[in-house]
Amino acid sequence: MIRLVTLAALPVLVLCQFDPSKWFMGSNLGGLQGFGVLPARCLNYLEAGYSRGNRLPSHRFFFNSTSGNCEQFVYYGRGGNRNNFRDVFKCMKSCGCKQQRNGGVPCNPPSQPVVRYYYDTFTKLCNTFQHTGCGGNSNHFKDWNDCFFTCGNGFET
């Protein structure tokens, strides 16, 4: 189910999936996992802005809601929209970490699932899950430290 709601006068997209066989391998809330709330700014399309005067373009990051990843682009210095971050950490903290966990799809040839960590926005904890090795989104990390320092309070600026 996809529903657009307003929280504190800010529109957000709420993504809910209910499947007790696939979601929440740890703390189980009846199969409802981590809410996956993406702020509206994360859903904006890429807007590179425009150049004026002798201002040099710079490399920035935007959240690609199709791929579920923070991606680099060239920003021309003026204009654009709020889906524009100075570094990948701010992009991840604002958007990437707020996605539901995604175990990916089986690779071809198949490989054994591996334990990865994802950030749960509901519990504000990094939890383990099985990743199949192919696909998924940017809310998966090789170890707890990477997860915590990217998404938790370990990387506050």
Curated annotation (Swiss-Prot):
Tissue: Nacreous layer of shell (at protein level).
The keyword Disulfide bond is annotated on this UniProt entry: yes
GO cellular component, one term: extracellular space
CDD domains per record: Kunitz-type (cd00109)
Listed Gene3D superfamilies: Pancreatic trypsin inhibitor Kunitz domain (4.10.410.10)
Signal peptide (from-to): 1-16
Chief localisation class: secreted
Record domain BPTI/Kunitz inhibitor: where: 42-95, 97-151
SUPFAM superfamilies xref list: BPTI-like (SSF57362)
Keywords: Disulfide bond, Protease inhibitor, Repeat, Secreted, Serine protease inhibitor, Signal
Keyword Ribosomal protein: no
Annotated GO MF terms: serine-type endopeptidase inhibitor activity
PROSITE patterns linked to this entry: BPTI_KUNITZ_1, BPTI_KUNITZ_2
Disulphide bond pairs: C42-C95, C70-C91, C97-C151, C107-C134, C126-C147
Pfam families xrefs: Kunitz_BPTI (PF00014)
InterPro entries with a match to the protein in the record: Kunitz_BPTI, Kunitz_BPTI_sf, Prtase_inh_Kunz-CS, TFPI/VKTCI-like
Source superkingdom: Eukaryota
Locations listed in the record: Secreted
Record's protein name: BPTI/Kunitz domain-containing protein 3
Organismal lineage: Eukaryota, Metazoa, Spiralia, Lophotrochozoa, Mollusca
